[in-house]
């Protein structure tokens, strides 16, 4: 324990040496297992969960907060998460989220609620008193959870209106209503209430490649994603920046997700982070100006910087069409980390019954056409380091092949589902799609074998959180879904 504490102290010193403030992240509720055993009757409910509303639990947290800053007096503040409490690598601790999942909303509540408003209020007030007021340190309270604090304005206000503002108290809110998916709306809890807000942005999205291929989200965050531009304002940060409670952004520059793909080059994550960070420093700058500056910093001249930024912008168009949809409601969880799900996550019967088959298939083809344009740009680029240029090209190839696999897999599952409903299968189309699909997987593996800088590859299986540490469910996923129709296509 002393060794870890000393490492943290050195890290805080290193952060300060760079002219930055040091804010450490912690989950609530997590307590030493031995302490819980001693005080179980005073801090746990009838189900054995630690109850933050109990006086002894709050007393323990007040003592803990005081001791943290006594041990690390130069620590500038804490980032508090209450929505996900994971205990995977801390065997001597125990914990749970503070909001009881079985709580029911009262009849006086007219909005979606998990009943946790009072708990959030009490916890925020405790943190405010112990850290912001008594110690003059900062608290960043994240609204992210599995309830409705981070998505429902009425819930948000019913918590925050009962917590006095303080110069050291910030509320952190994801820019999207929910997790970091395309097609999710801009967060309606941004820009409301009295408390200063810091907007959270993920630069390495686990649902969209984790940097294995171009995925430029900075433009969409700042100016509005294509799918949001007919929404009521604000739908982007440039429409929020003049709000007096907007206090800035913080990026998840890396991280997100549970497994791969694992990247060897941070280029695409770095691009998102750089553009957002420079904009946060000067919100008068445009996304385009900053993107070109990034490219010039990588050694590209004016023409090549323009090309690079065009490639980046096109990636957002390709991804929303290839992985999500502007036409129908597609389950945004069908790919995550290194896994590709299949019919178990996608409602092909619904697509068919809504009459969207041809439009959806055309949309997937449009995604591939955009990826081809991106490849053309990538291979025309000049004027940067050889290593960077090689990664731009191979990562764009990676995206092109992967999304081509998505497209052919989608075609097979769609045509297979049509056959399931009608009893008549389009064998010719299925056979052609399988030939393309099988070749694409070989091309994908060849790309990785010939380009060591490529990220690790996706797998045609489903993600399952119960299957640690691989999280790989081989009984479900793209392979199982298409193989069902492989037998039909080649046995007739």
Where are these regions (language model features)?
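C-terminal non-catalytic alpha-helical accessory regions
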Residues: 244-468, 472, 477, 490-492
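Aromatic-lined carbohydrate-binding surfaces of glycoside hydrolases
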Residues: 1-178, 208-210, 253-281, 314-317, ...
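Noncatalytic linker/hinge segments flanking ATPase motor cores
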Residues: 15, 22-24, 64-68, 182-186, ...
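Tryptophan-rich aromatic "cage" segments
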Residues: 483-491
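Active-site core of glycosidic bond-cleaving carbohydrate-active enzymes
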Residues: 168-257, 263, 365
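Intrinsically disordered terminal tails
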Residues: 478-482
